[in-house]
Swiss-Prot record:
This is Uncharacterized protein C32D5.7. It comes from Caenorhabditis elegans. Residues 1-95 are annotated as: Disordered. Residues 31-47 have a biased composition (Low complexity).
Length: 435
């Protein structure tokens, strides 16, 4: 028993290894043995197994962390047969390798999952950019073809409703087929179920409201073409700049409300078609006087509805001129003043300036002493022109001077100096100047 107790205490100090568990099954045999040689051999065997397990553990850790650490940095115990004290190598800087260790400590499944999450995110961003570019291209195409799309929707809805009403109304007049419905109850089997005046009145009011909204949309579409484009130069006048600004405002409003207006107009067209089918297609009227009157009123409302669209186009569309006479002259025409030359234009400008100066001074406009001779177009830029002979004194200008030089020295080419008339009123201390 004296040998067993020290060994058990030593055994508790050794680590738990598979070899220890294997040898633990033979533990009772050591208790029954006697002799110091067997005990010493068992102790050396266990020590060697412990060293071997620690060495295998260090080699496994070294192989795992070899890409990021030094080969001998993690060897905590130096295996040596000498009885000297084991020494540990210097520790590496763990702060530098913390991120790398965390990355390597992750399992392969986590790494695959992370890469799979990153790659779809990149793909999704690329898909989003492509989708946004496609949406922008579609919106630009819709804005460029706004009027084509709008008129297509209006025309399709118009002809669909008109064809439906015409078909069901003619069918009800040519081949009348009155439908009679009775309740399933035995006590009310003789009672008829159908539309009376209340149903017809509600349907007519709903049709008028929806049709009014459609006509307003079509009216705005019709007159908007002349407001969305401004042919004037905004730099010429303030009015032209205001028109250009208003055109930009209308275009912006159209682009911001385009989809909603198209959707609302399409829904309204479906509602009108459903009302027409309910009123004319289903012939289940009770046959009372009020129902008959409301049915004819509905016919009148529908006819006015289908007439209003082409009438609005003819009256308000800027490019449709059905009521204009073909032989009518243009609104703005220049008066026929005959043939005019550059000399006569200068004379008229000078005379107008003299008249304005005469009115400003309060006197009578100057009277031309020498009236200008008649204008002869065939003698323009010729020496025989009467306008050229009027200011030349006999023998003052030689005939060898070129015509253009003589024309430039003509007094008609020189504007008179403006005369300033200053009126001073000493009593009122005011000075009035006319130019």
């Amino acid at each position: 028993m004296s040998y067993y107790e020290p060994y058990s205490s030593r055994q508790r100090m050794l680590p738990n290894t598979p070899d220890n568990y294997d040898d633990a099954s033979d533990h009772p045999q050591f208790a029954s043995r006697s002799g110091s040689s067997s005990l010493q051999s068992s102790l050396s065997k266990r020590a060697n197994s412990t060293r071997r397990s620690l060495k295998e553990l260090s080699e496994g850790v070294q192989q795992r962390f070899q890409p990021i650490t030094h080969g001998r940095s993690l060897q905590r115990i130096t295996e040596d047969d000498s009885p000297s004290t084991p020494t540990a190598p210097p520790r590496p800087n763990r702060q530098l390798y913390r991120n790398s260790i965390d990355h390597l400590s992750m399992s392969e499944g986590a790494l695959k999952q992370q890469t799979s999450e990153e790659s779809p995110s990149e793909v999704s961003e690329g898909q989003r950019s492509n989708w946004s570019q496609s949406v922008v291209k579609i919106e630009n195409a819709l804005h460029r073809n706004y009027y084509t799309i709008a008129y297509s929707i209006v025309i399709i809805a118009y002809f669909a409703g008109f064809a439906e009403y015409l078909y069901f109304r003619l069918t009800s007049l040519i081949v009348p087929e009155h439908l009679v419905f009775h309740p399933p109850c035995e006590g009310k089997a003789t009672r008829k179920i159908g539309k009376d005046g209340f149903h017809y009145g509600i349907s007519i009011c709903a049709f008028i409201g929806v049709a009014t909204f459609q006509l307003m949309c079509f009216f705005g579409l019709t007159i908007s073409e002349k407001w969305t484009q401004s042919k004037e130069n905004p730099r010429e006048s303030r009015r032209a700049a205001q028109r250009e600004e208003f055109a930009l405002f209308v275009r912006t409003m159209i682009s911001s409300t385009m989809y909603r207006v198209f959707l609302c107009y399409g829904i309204c067209s479906l509602i009108n078609c459903a009302i027409i089918f309910y009123m004319v297609g289903i012939q289940d009227s009770l046959g009372d006087v009020v129902s008959t009157i409301f049915l004819y009123v509905f016919d009148a409302v529908v006819i006015l509805y289908f007439i209003a669209f082409p009438l609005t186009t003819v009256i308000y569309h800027p490019y449709v001129h059905c009521f204009r006479r073909r032989g009518a002259p243009a609104r703005f025409t220049l008066p026929d003043v005959g043939q005019r030359t550059q000399t006569s234009t200068l004379e008229s400008n000078i005379s107008g300036l003299e008249e304005a100066m005469g009115k400003a001074t309060g006197g009578t406009p100057p009277v031309h002493r020498n009236p200008s001779p008649p204008v002869i177009p065939s003698l323009n830029f010729s020496r025989q022109d009467p306008l050229r002979q009027g200011h030349r004194s006999t023998g003052s200008i030689s005939t060898d001077i070129p015509v253009l030089e003589e024309y430039l020295h003509s007094p008609r080419r020189q504007l008179p100096q403006p005369r300033l008339a200053v009126e001073e009123n000493l009593d009122d201390e005011r000075i009035t100047t006319f130019v």
